[in-house]
Amino acid sequence: MIKNNLIYALKDGKLTHISEVESGLNCACICPSCGESLVAKKGNRMIHHFAHKANSECIYGYQTSLHLLAKDILLEEKRILLPKVQINFYAHDGSHKEVEISNEKFLELDNVVLEKKQGEIIPDVIAYCGNKKLYIEIYVTHKIDDNKRNRIIKDDVSTIEIDLSEVDRYISKDMLKKILLEETAQKQWIYNSVENKWYKKFINDADSFEMKGSRINNCPIRTRVDKHGNPYAVFIKDCIYCEYCVDVIRDQEGFNLGIKCTGAKRISEISDYSKTINERIAISNQKLYEMRIEDLSKGLCPFCLTELVKRVGKYGVFYACSNYSYCNFTYSIDEETGELKCKYQLL
């Protein structure tokens, strides 16, 4: 099978490209996986490659050669470009918000070793930086399975997977070097210990709110106000898009029971932890106030986004929510002072 053809083999213990050796058995090369002698096939009508002398089926030769090539590059360059790190807070039906921890960055390496057993797993490549280590998994034919993923999480070691499943089977060293050192599109975090730490911190700082029908009562940012003046939010319309919703509480059957919300503490980004609670509330309230004033300017109720209608009452002109059976919001403007007077406070 062409996907198992080798373009790199071991010669005198060194990974060697097919272009660097003589044809046939004179190449004096062995398979990097099984150790069997190889034949260098360099005819005029074929793409040059190594083949096993006995035509045996070795399904790991190509993959192992890529592991070795990646190791050689990382040892030479002593660095790797890592993808950005972000927390994904899954909210509903796959939708989620992202909180960025760090952008793409280079990790300077002290050492790189290949396929060395670590507890219950054998990572493809282990990169060391000081007293920390990074597992690098190279996906050629099989992605990391759940069993290996769970063991990586248990070991609390940051791990990236590099997807080479769609790259040219005759990838050159320069092409792989570009992927390792200049690109992140083919890299993804299988697990990141820093992300996990921050995720736990957000969840621990969140309050639990029970769902009643589709409603979450006592919304800490007063997304909506009912006709009795009680704050609430609608799960499907508000919570899943809210910057403070960090998790959805579900039962074993997957039914939604409530949410985890950081609204009371006004925490939505990593940078919020560097501010005091009073600073966070002030910033959040200013943003909410501006949003609600903008809704009023559009003729919409700031609490349910229903159209406001103009009415005339005992004390003159006022504007009322047209969703009157559920929302009693009204406002008027003092003719003398221009002051905005609302039945419910905007904050």
Q: Residue locations for each model-derived region?
A:
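A generic structural motif
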Residues: 30, 126-128, 300, 322
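N-terminal cysteine/histidine-rich coordination modules
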Residues: 1-77
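Active-site metal-binding core of divalent-cation-utilizing nuclease and nuclease-like domains
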Residues: 19-21, 81-137
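Short beta-strand-initiation
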Residues: 26, 120-122, 296
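Catalytic cores of nucleic-acid endonucleases
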Residues: 109-194, 307
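Non-catalytic C-terminal interaction segments of nucleic acid-processing enzymes
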Residues: 14, 158-160, 164-347
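Short glycine-aromatic motifs
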Residues: 38, 104-112, 242, 308
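Short strand-connecting beta-turns/loops that link adjacent beta-strands
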Residues: 45, 130-131, 314
